[in-house]
């Protein structure tokens, strides 16, 4: 995995979930760990709204016809800008086939998917219960809610004190949560904060 990134004051969480999913999938496939450009997605994905929100599936559709650029080639600015995609300065050996969905509201399906590669998921993140997280497993589904408003990356599955959880990489810097990560409880419904409601990943 690349280090935890920071989206800043821009509603671009969906781009970080997207790049994280592709970074992980490409590393598993090739052994090469790359850091892809979130700003390319902010500026260039027509099916989303840049700093005003979007979803990972739109990124995966975009990559069907465009190659990912590197963070260094197209650095993050945390604001909307004109698209300056350059195919000659992209990873033109990485061909995404589009989004692949994981069965919604199915703990085992998401668990099995996460064992294969990182998965982009959507959660509710506007509650104090979530925002003030520091350690342990969040288990109160009612306190967290399921009004999906934030995209993050599921990178693992585990158990702590009898509670199954998905390990989530956030995009609020390594100063948030547990070094940038949070453990969201897994259950037989939506998952805590809705983590099991809308999972998908890029096909390679």
PLM features: what roles do these ranges have?
Residues 1-204:
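Catalytic-core signature of thiol
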